[in-house]
């Protein structure tokens, strides 16, 4: 018996094959009523897509020569355009997202926190629809780690993903670095270099947004040393901008031999320390950090993976909130640097701060 083809289904539905193809992928460029009618007809007639054909077509659509396929929206919830340009993490995430989107034939429309369109958020779903947006990426979660309530009307209909930080709610797809393993491996690297008293310096708000993954891994990575947990915890200092005096007081009391941090400001502060200078490593290392060692979180790959999540679900016609959200995590790589040698590092006035 001859299998039902897309051409047969198109003839029965009274539309073209391209319309059927888009409707079966639940593409928002086709009216919802038409999509539902064609999907119901396909089910009634027993139509099944040929998986090999779908694979080949997917490869063709994702080739480097792909023409314009649609648009993605990148929404900076707490991120202004200027902050996105200044912050090395956001810059890398955006670069990875935009480069991958371009390679797949997608345009990226940006909506920043200081954009009037974003501030008038009740109108944003209509704007996205008018622009033919097919997928949405969110960047910069609020401190409580949840998406704002006004995004519900967007994520209930669009393919959506969060960049960089997994939201506590709602359950939508996320692309991020594996922050727990990043911190854990960084401590192990310091141990391998003979450091016995590493300390952790970071913003408590950031660690809370990451549900404690940096600090939890810092503690867990040292339990095998036999040192009591409460003594290890004393070597965590919650960073406060400009609080150099409290930092130096804590540093003198705890006497760490190495510091893991997300704050470059620590280096010039340490020049006023009256004890031995520690080795330094950054938990979110970037090539712009002259002389620093640390963990390269591969944020460009995180950004690219977010595009792959969006495009793969679009290809399967999966829109709205997923039944089971995917979290794609990228591992970090250790990068050596002069900051592991305090005498050399602090004698060089060109180090990043």
Please tell me what each predicted stretch does.
Residues 1-61, 353:
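N-terminal helix-turn-helix DNA-binding module of bacterial transcription factors
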Residues 6, 19, 249-353:
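Flexible loop/turn connectors
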Residues 47-125, 134, 219:
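Amphipathic helical "hinge" segments at domain boundaries
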Residues 73, 132-141, 199-203, 233-236, ...:
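Periplasmic-binding protein-like
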Residues 101-115, 198-201, 212-242:
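Short beta-strand elements in bilobed, periplasmic/extracellular small-molecule ligand-binding domains
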Residues 139-182, 279-295:
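Flexible loop/hinge segments that line or gate small-molecule binding clefts
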Residues 173-200, 242-248, 296-318:
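Hydrophobic alpha-helical segments within soluble ligand-binding/sensing domains
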Residues 186-225, 319-341:
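An alpha-beta-alpha
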